[in-house]
């Protein structure tokens, strides 16, 4: 069976590493570059949004140190559904294999009084403090003010098109895991 060559010339492709472009799946290189750019943009946005929420709340985070992307992801994961979480559950949800990095983020969040920990037998459960809940609400307000209006142009506001993109990204993640 002969593989049909893509109709887009390689010179027109937007990729991060031309030496990785495959004749069988050149589009995959384009998707990978899109993921790289989107991930970094999303990370920068999360850090800036959290810094804005922290400034509005007038709290000190970890002695003045800004929260990084993993700290913020862990923070929102702990707050999710207002139920205490185990380290393993947070790692699983975020698809992070290096649990020590998540553990470090949780310690940083505890030091900032955004998250608390409580030992139950051999397990440690993490929960959001009242200060943390307030900060999550402030972050949500920043997110609403900055992103929701920009979201509407994707498909007229129904969200179906972006929902399909999210589904495709979850499927793609299975290829890399």
Describe these PLM feature segments.
Residues 47-97:
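N-terminal helix-turn-helix DNA-binding core of bacterial DNA-binding proteins
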Residues 82-124:
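Canonical helix-turn-helix DNA-binding module
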Residues 141-177:
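Terminal interaction helix/tail motif
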